[in-house]
């Protein structure tokens, strides 16, 4: 297995914890961002300086020692870290050049300028790392290496409990509130039990509605897992430019749940079934109640192996040197 430097997010931690102890020992969690004007200025100088900035310690000393301990020819996966300054500094503290970066966001996300994001990708590729994406459109447009989206097997967390909600959603706004409210109001009027929970955009106010629960802050991932177990079906609404498989889709597959989605690309998945996926604006809306009650077809043995983190990460063992 390659060494891994991973972002400090709770979902990432959930994936990493699926690794056996001997493999988990090869994982470094990247430090959270340190706030402060002085530190930010010195960090920027260190990032763009061709050598290490004398007298400046960009990350905690134990972390820097662990970076230096990675062997010169060892394969290394940088998982979900895209900050250019951090990556430029990391490169100066790593002896290996067999490095891959997996981007866990679409190239053009909902809040960034197209040209700015394109510049970011050019800088990312200019570091000399091999850049991987789960999104086929991004791979084609920007010359990135395509790989699978990733999740993990969840047997220790999956519970067979009576469903409390027919449809469950959790996510940030990302310009999806209006659609969530419309769908929620339609489904509630049809007698369906919904729980659509949304983290608001900072500074934005929202009209009152019983269809969408506006959260004061994000919830921890174990609480999300508990809600998934208590739902019959999950809802995903993808970003406008996204074509790749989402984590929400994999949550549904691994937790044995149905999925309602606005992504027609799910029809191309090897495990697509009309009894497993309901595509908004393509499948008849009147069919939704029957879809929710139809038994979920079983998946073939091993069908999800390519998306399971412990299997997925093995592809990076064979990284060529930059």
Regions found by a protein language model. Name each.
Residues 88-188:
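Catalytic core of nucleotide-activated saccharide and alditol-phosphate transferases
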Residues 76, 99, 130-131, 234, ...:
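Short, well-ordered beta-strand core segments
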Residues 69-70, 123-124, 226-227:
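Structural alpha-helical scaffold elements that stabilize or flank donor/cofactor-binding regions
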Residues 8-13, 132-140, 198-204, 262-267:
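Short, polar loop motifs at secondary-structure junctions
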Residues 1-104, 110, 266, 311, ...:
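N-terminal pre-catalytic "stem/leader" segment of glycosyltransferase-like enzymes
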Residues 19, 206-216, 221-320:
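Catalytic binding pocket for nucleotide-activated donors in carbohydrate/polymer assembly enzymes
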Residues 21-31, 40-48, 128-130, 141-153, ...:
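Active-site regions of enzymes building and remodeling cell-envelope glycoconjugates
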Residues 184-203:
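A conserved nucleotide-sugar
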